[in-house]
Amino acid sequence: MYESKICEILTHIRKPGDFRTPPKIAIISPTSYSRTVVADSIAREISVLVKRKNFSGEPFGKRELENLFEEHAVYVCEECQYLYERRPHGFDLLRLFLSSLVTNSRQVITTWNQYSWNFLSGFLHIERWFPIIITLPLLSLPELKKYLIADGKENLHFIIDTELDNSLELVRKDYDITISSLNLSFSIPYLTVQRRYASYIPLLADKQALPEELIFREIYRLSSGEPGIALKIFHDAIVEDEIRVTHLPKPLSVPELYAIDIFVLTLILMYELPVYSRLNESIQDKAMLNSSLYRLVSSGLVIRNEEVWCISLEGFAPVVDYLKQRRMIW
């Protein structure tokens, strides 16, 4: 997965005997799964030369950032959005980190949450610090199918055990535009009408689509092409050597929410480990926070996994679309 992106990053790694200052690299994706997979692959390729720093779980402060790039190595700094999202005065830490990128000659590869990066791009023009920006796109249906089959069990049986609703539905899509000369990327939303499932293979109207194709199409629709979410749905749906339509989660639609609910969803989407205490730091009225979490759980959009609150798998795509429409993320 993302082989071409990994190869592109490796071409920018400084070779022995090359004394030029290597470009700083930013890897961006909507969820942590994709960028973690790519970071792991890069670290394996340059194993003896790499030092990794993950800002989502390791303690750090001003002193650690000032001494971060002392050793001769290739640095992979992961989840860099938590430099400013984790604590008061976080933007001071972020600026210190960015300044240290400019003042050292080390090879530095960073990973970022897509929504945090978009905010920093509008607020700080953060792309100025990174000559090489690698965006990990959502997978297409054929790419997602190939990835899941490679990771799944052999000899799986795909079974359609319920009547499928093949009605027309209105789908929001984005047309991506990149202006290389301005180092600018943006998307234009548009609406299209399509059937929920393809009962027949295009151009072969007399040949019905296989159950395997219909099930992968539903997984793709539920995950919006996000490989980490699709992999979780795929594995959870496998019972012994069968995967049935009824094993897949039901798609959700987001009801009209209060402003506080939208804010809570935004916090959960941004934080790597959104435990209750962290949400309470942003929303200090516990009664208001508890009421919002109750509404979100009741609608199936949010679940609690031990101490961590997270957006449900089937709720991720509609929640992201909902927040984009209200300009909470972009």
Enumerate the language-model features and the residues they cover.
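Short glycine-rich substrate-engagement loop in P-loop NTPases that contacts/grips substrate
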Residues: 47-72, 88-89
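Sensor-1/coupling segment of RecA-like P-loop NTPase cores
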Residues: 82-83, 90-124, 130-137, 141-144
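Short amphipathic alpha-helical interaction segments
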Residues: 283-299, 304, 314
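Short, amphipathic alpha-helical interaction segments positioned at domain boundaries
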Residues: 315-330
